[in-house]
């Protein structure tokens, strides 16, 4: 009897999650059609919290929302998940474009404090501009940033650096000893595949289309 009750409760919980998944997916679709990306992102986060298996469309809408909000690393991660379901030409080309034009950076102030991130030349591409703007705002508020930035020259907390695709860059700036020798700056670089491949694997090839 106890086992039957437990199974019944489990089935009810699963049905409830499935219904909630359907509801959120429909809302995401409607918001995406209107290009209300902040709303899409909020609903996508709710969807992730359900712990259900996301569909290809869920992941693609999530990727577009992350890109529109300047979170290129989030966009890449969601595209990569989508590619495991369906490796379309659009998905793979977008992943390669990110790998070829962005670099992975981690910027840290010790202790954390709001600081300044500036770029030498504002990117022409709107997605790249949005990514830069999002990073600048986050650094101003938090003094730290970890994610993808467009390739180019930047200055973080007075420390110049260059973002290059295929190179992971970590910069740690501390104000200690500022009165005597200036700020302590630690810079470390690590090779990556492209930039967005967080596990070192290159994007998959598109699935051949049937003739």
Protein language model regions, located:
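Acidic, Pro/Ser/Gly/Ala-rich intrinsically disordered segments
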Residues: 1-211
